[in-house]
Amino acid sequence: MRCISRLPAVLLILSVALGHLRATPVGSGTNPQVDKRKCNTATCATQRLANFLVRSSNNLGPVLPPTNVGSNTYGKRNVAEDPNRESLDFLLL
């Protein structure tokens, strides 16, 4: 319970600290994919804070599993799959 009572103060301090961060412009490099993955300081800090808060405690709500964004995620189409039968099943309704 002591941890929960200190949470508003910690969040207030973190929000003030994040408010003072300045966004840095993303410089153009030679590789456009690397440029897309760069982020400014405020964005990275906000994402890390959100990630920490979501996974920090069970008392604050559900702990969400990490998002799977790899090549084998749900919804990706298998290249070797036969598209004739499975892709037309919705038309039979």
Curated annotation (Swiss-Prot):
Keyword terms, alphabetized: Amidation, Amyloid, Cleavage on pair of basic residues, Disulfide bond, Hormone, Secreted, Signal
Record-listed Tyrosine amide modification sites: 74
Tissue specificity as recorded in UniProt: Abundant in the islets of Langerhans but is not present in the brain or seven other tissues examined.
Gene3D superfamilies (alphabetical): 6.10.250.2190
Residue ranges the record assigns to the propeptide: 24-35, 78-93
GO cellular component terms attached to this protein's record: extracellular space; neuronal cell body; secretory granule
Molecular function in Gene Ontology: hormone activity; identical protein binding; lipid binding; receptor ligand activity; signaling receptor binding
Signal peptide: 1-23
GO biological process, alphabetically ordered: amylin receptor 1 signaling pathway; amylin receptor 2 signaling pathway; amylin receptor 3 signaling pathway; amylin receptor signaling pathway; bone resorption; eating behavior; glucose metabolic process; negative regulation of bone resorption
Known role: Amylin/IAPP is a glucoregulatory peptide hormone that plays an important role in the regulation of energy homeostasis. Selectively inhibits insulin-stimulated glucose utilization and glycogen deposition in muscle, while not affecting adipocyte glucose metabolism. IAPP function is mediated by the CALCR-RAMPs (AMYRs) receptor complexes. Amylin can also bind CALCR receptor in the absence of RAMPs, although it is more selective for AMYRs.
Similarity remark: Belongs to the calcitonin family.
Protein name per the record: Islet amyloid polypeptide
Taxonomic placement: Eukaryota, Metazoa, Chordata, Craniata, Vertebrata
Gene: Iapp
